[in-house]
Amino acid sequence: MENLDALVAQALEAVQSAEDVNALEQIRVHYLGKKGELTQVMKTLGNLPAEERPQVGALINVAKERVTEVLNARKASLEEADLAAKLAAESIDVTLPGRGQASGGLHPITRTLERIEQFFTHIGYGIAEGPEVEDDYHNFEALNIPGHHPARSMHDTFYFNANMLLRTHTSPVQVRTMEANKPPIRIVCPGRVYRSDSDITHSPMFHQVEGLLVDRDINFADLKGTIEEFLRVFFEKELAVRFRPSFFPFTEPSAEVDMECVMCSGKGCRVCKQTGWLEVMGCGMVHPNVLRMSGIDPEEFSGFAFGMGVERLAMLRYGVNDLRLFFDNDLRFLAQFR
């Protein structure tokens, strides 16, 4: 048994001197494995007298249990040390500044739409929407646009068939609103519209906001005051505004609205072509035929309507000189509007 005590002492010393889990595993195999030294001692029991075997076997089992207990404790200690070292190597310095998440922002067209809608809802207008795939009647006939009008040609309008098309303006929403509601009516109609045109200042798809007010005793002075106040609030400055006589089939009288150039304050520049004025929208008093076809008596009610291109207003407000930049999805451009 002296040899057993010496073997146990040797095993315990080896366990305590192990510097890592792999070395500890080799020690376990060397002493406790199938061919380990303590296992081999157990196999020598067959050489002892029968009366000595139980006592010696018990001593060997106690020795193996002691070595196993110390080995497991050393293994736990080494694993804990390894984990602590790994955590220390991977630790995060919470005092360092974090990486900020890149935040998005509203598209300049969306910002412009919201700005327009905010003004008109503030003065009592509602928001009305309608289908982008429209029928010929609501897009043209109900708006007093005759069959020979150039806007009805395939060069300007995207047709699906003889009767269905992509709306060329949001005016059909006004017609549908008048058909479904009795005056007084106060609405703006924002939305996408489509025309067969594409260059530096035109896009086949663009956004438009049209407005309509129908009530008793509405006159051109009401229209003029509304538009002048809108432009003042939208551009956040006092601007000279003029109304030029024009023609639209759905309004009579009709006018084009020009405002003082926001780039040069009316002095003349490349943007306004040295005129000092910028065209911003069309407007007029709703034509009696349009009211009549919508089921409203033009002898009792009158109204005004106006329409503006959202991209046009956004270009002027933000100083953008190419319409196509709004649709290129270039984050370097869009990031300016956050």
From Swiss-Prot:
Signal peptide: none
Keyword terms, alphabetized: Aminoacyl-tRNA synthetase, ATP-binding, Cytoplasm, Ligase, Magnesium, Metal-binding, Nucleotide-binding, Protein biosynthesis
Top class in the EC scheme: ligase
Enzyme Commission number(s) of this protein: 6.1.1.20
Record-linked PROSITE patterns: AA_TRNA_LIGASE_II
Binding site for Mg(2+): 252
GO MF terms held by the record: ATP binding; magnesium ion binding; phenylalanine-tRNA ligase activity; tRNA binding
Predominant place of localization: cytoplasm
UniProt cofactor(s): Mg(2+)
Pfam families for the chain: Phe_tRNA-synt_N, tRNA-synt_2d
Known catalytic reactions: tRNA(Phe) + L-phenylalanine + ATP = L-phenylalanyl-tRNA(Phe) + AMP + diphosphate + H(+)
Subcellular location: Cytoplasm
Subunit: Tetramer of two alpha and two beta subunits.
Record-stated family: Belongs to the class-II aminoacyl-tRNA synthetase family. Phe-tRNA synthetase alpha subunit type 1 subfamily.
Name the record gives this protein: Phenylalanine--tRNA ligase alpha subunit
Gene field: pheS
